Amino acid sequence: MRKLERKFLSEDKTPALRNVVGFGMGSNSIDVALRWNTKEKQQEFRRQIYNSPAIRFEGKLDPIVDNREGVSTYQGISLKAEKPSYPLGTTEIRFTITNHSGEEFVYGDAYSITAQGTDGNWFVVPTDCSFTAIGHVLSDGQSGTITAHLFPDILPNKPGVYRFFYKDSIGGEKVPFMATFELK
């Protein structure tokens, strides 16, 4: 466990190490959470970082299908990508959230991204796995920014359409906001 901790805290952030989002001691295991959790990435972890029969990987195996949809505007709150398309190697994408609701609106930083697969289904893309619980206040008429991160060194970006999701409560109703962008 100490060896794993030293590697995780080191400055040498290889793609295999950047794929690790957390680890801890279970009752009889070392539990590891990966940003992109596939059999191949688990083997990469064992080869490059740490191999032990005590390792147990958490969560479902990727890719995880997520065909949900959302809205770009709801009761005066709107969400859109700063640009309609970005280069394939992009690691950061900005989204503008605008308030024309007639009252103050508070938004946070948590989000998720899906990409369209060759079969037409949408699958979850590895992004930031933890977010600071913060509230950004927008007065009526103001706009703010949510910055999303992609990790092409963990899962190479493919050309195509992507969906950015941000969920918030408005008037007691959970609203799934969605904005699309393209990588090419």
Question: Which stretches of residues belong to each language-model region?
Answer:
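A short tyrosine-centered beta-strand micro-motif
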Residues: 157-168
